[in-house]
Regions:
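Short, charged recognition helix plus adjacent turn
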Residues: 1-8, 44, 72-79
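A short, Lys/Arg-rich alpha-helix, primarily the initiator
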Residues: 1-24
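DNA major-groove recognition helix of helix-turn-helix/homeodomain DNA-binding modules
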Residues: 55-70
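Short alpha-helical DNA-recognition segment
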Residues: 25-44
Length: 79
């Protein structure tokens, strides 16, 4: 996969993570407390600056009560 497409995908995942947090009425501090990840790491994912690995994705989805497909851009919209 070309680097440009990979970066764009990470940004889309980050945008969806941010929207899922808003929908769950959860800020970075709360999500960090539930998952054990730092607020800085969560921000890096939101901004698309860090790759989100499957184990991290599952933990975030569990805390946010969303399906992984919602963050992985497999749906057109986050409902």
């Amino acid at each position: 996969m070309p680097r440009e497409n990979h970066v764009a995908k990470q940004r889309r995942i980050g945008e969806r993570l941010s929207r899922a947090m808003v929908k769950a009425h959860m800020d970075r501090k709360e999500l960090a407390a539930l998952t054990g990840y730092s607020e800085t790491q969560i921000l890096s994912w939101e901004l698309g600056r860090a790759e989100l690995y499957p184990t991290e994705l599952i933990k975030l989805c569990h805390a946010l009560d969303v399906m992984p497909e919602c963050l992985l851009c497999w749906e057109r919209r986050l409902h």
